[in-house]
Swiss-Prot record:
Keywords: ATP-binding, Ligase, Nucleotide-binding, Protein biosynthesis. Its EC number is 6.3.5.7. Belongs to the amidase family. GatA subfamily. This is Glutamyl-tRNA(Gln) amidotransferase subunit A. Heterotrimer of A, B and C subunits. SUPFAM superfamilies: Amidase signature (AS) enzymes. InterPro entries: Amidase, Amidase_CS, Amidase_dom, AS_sf, GatA. The active site is at K77 (charge relay system), S152 (charge relay system), S176 (acyl-ester intermediate). The gene is gatA. Allows the formation of correctly charged Gln-tRNA(Gln) through the transamidation of misacylated Glu-tRNA(Gln) in organisms which lack glutaminyl-tRNA synthetase. The reaction takes place in the presence of glutamine and ATP through an activated gamma-phospho-Glu-tRNA(Gln).
Length: 488
């Protein structure tokens, strides 16, 4: 018997009633992972021994009836540090790296007696939108194994969508939670910048990165955010603001809520069927009592260019630490210190990572800094101001998560510009540090379509309120791929 169809609350009730034990739930989860892993390739590492040991310890002390997450398995993206469990960032550079500490988000999960079941596949150093740049394997879409799962948190999304786990953690720098959530028909939230500590997250773009949750439903997503969100003295960008319970508004109606629909989000480059799906969702929100009106975010069209200058510049700085000296991969054909650096980085990094390091180094170089990095920062401010103007009059922004449904494996991985453009709807949210969620909103050609809801900073509870209201009157979240036992 598999438990992957049961919600976290249902699993908690079973655990409290001792109808199942944490060990039994962990064993069943491991079976679900193994039976589906060959088809989707969600995991880099499955920490079976450690997970069963932790489950046994939880059983020995007893399930806490007041702790919803006690004994619940959790998958963690492989750029989030886990003490004693390989954390590779899907790179040859860190193929053998075992951290000696836990990321704060993981420590928070352990504090709630969650069980880390394994580390999920991703694009190398979170640089990519298809989970095809991983050094280890290519993850496949849960709905169609010839399609990409999205990225960079592709493994975390497919692990949930395929029924391997109920909950997972990802990271989002330019859409890396929301895009794979959309492609796989699950719920993925990028929290407000600073809501979840970045301590222990292997850095890509430090002003953009944010850890967030994946789940099959809106409420379960909010329940996981309750666990991982916290202020943290170890992260200088950690926000002091902390919502007591992100589920507090779930179930409330949205009558009177004002929702903005940017015309730029339905313009050139958006698949017509995606546009139709979003417009249908807008009508659904209106039927629920919200007002939906067209607005403009005029500088959003510059988001991709701005992002790839800023993110690559920050990456070129952050990735300087990987040099073959302290830990991780080291080239064995070097004859001196310079060759250690050059050969290690040439052999240890994949093509996409090297491309972004070169772009970032160029953007920061003397003579080009003002024309590229400084200018990108100025346009980033204009993008933020666009959002501020809209949120002066509206509660939320509505739009598609992605311009298309999942594309084929090996179709865009040799065309970096086309791959970058796939993030044009998610990137502005990171540039502005805002919260954004992707929820299932329909299907095109049998593949899931994601609907994105964006709010002002620290309004995750309002986003969850609107998302849950939409979820309650639709059944897209209930439809499952064949690998999960569905009929799609």
């Amino acid at each position: 018997m598999s438990f992957n169809h049961k919600t976290i609350e249902e699993l908690h009730d079973l655990l409290v009633a001792k109808e199942i034990s944490a060990t039994e739930l962990t064993q069943k989860t491991l079976e679900d992972i193994k039976s589906r892993e060959e088809a989707v390739g969600s995991f880099i590492t499955v920490s079976e021994e450690a997970a069963l040991k932790q489950a046994a310890a939880i059983d020995a002390k007893g399930i806490d009836a007041d702790n919803l997450m006690s004994g619940i398995p959790l998958a963690v993206k492989d750029n989030i540090s886990t003490k004693g469990i390989l954390t590779t960032a899907a790179s040859k550079m860190l193929y053998n790296y075992e951290p000696i500490f836990d990321a704060t988000s993981v420590a928070n999960a352990y504090a709630k007696d969650m069980i880390v079941i394994g580390k999920t596949n991703m694009d190398e150093f979170a640089m990519g939108g298809s989970t095809e740049t991983s050094y280890f394997k290519k993850t496949k879409n849960a709905w169609d194994h010839t399609k990409v799962p999205g990225g960079s948190s592709g493994g975390s999304a497919t692990a949930v969508a395929s029924g391997q786990v109920r909950l997972s953690l990802g990271s989002d720098t330019g859409g890396s939670i929301r895009q794979p959530a959309a492609f796989n028909g699950v719920v993925g939230l990028k929290p407000t910048y600073g809501t979840v500590s970045r301590y222990g997250l292997i850095a890509f773009g430090s002003s953009l990165d944010q850890i967030g949750p994946f789940a099959p439903t809106v409420k379960e997503n909010a329940q996981l955010l309750n666990v991982i969100a916290s202020s943290d003295v170890k992260d200088a960008t950690s926000a002091p603001v902390r919502i007591a319970d992100y589920t507090s508004k779930i179930g409330r109606d949205i009558k009177g809520m004002k929702i903005a629909l940017p015309k730029e989000y339905l313009g050139e480059g958006i698949d017509p069927e995606i546009k139709e799906t979003v417009l249908a969702a807008a009508k659904q929100f209106e039927a629920l009592g919200a007002t939906v009106e067209e607005v403009s975010l005029p500088h959003s069209k510059y988001g991709v260019a701005v992002y790839y200058i800023i993110a690559s510049s920050e990456a070129s700085s952050n990735l300087q630490r990987f040099d073959g000296i302290r830990y991780g991969f080291r080239a064995d054909d070097a004859k001196n210190l310079d060759e250690i650096y050059v050969n290690t980085r040439s052999q240890g990094f994949g093509d996409e990572v090297k491309r972004r390091i070169m772009l970032g180094t160029f953007s920061l170089s003397s003579g080009y800094y003002d024309a590229y990095f400084k200018k990108a920062g100025q346009v980033r401010t204009l993008i933020i101001e666009d959002f501020d103007k809209v949120f002066a009059d509206y509660d939320l922004i509505l739009g598609p998560t992605t311009p298309t449904v999942a594309f084929g494996l090996d179709t865009l991985n040799h065309d970096p510009v086309a791959m970058y453009l796939a993030d044009l709807l998610t990137i502005p949210v990171n540039l502005a540090g805002l919260p954004g969620i992707s929820i299932p909103a329909g299907f095109v050609d049998g593949l899931p379509v994601g609907l994105q809801l964006i709010g002002p900073k620290y309004t995750e509870e309002t986003i969850y309120q609107a998302a849950a209201a939409f979820e309650a009157v639709t059944d897209y979240h209930k439809q499952q791929p064949i690998i999960f036992g569905g009929d799609k």
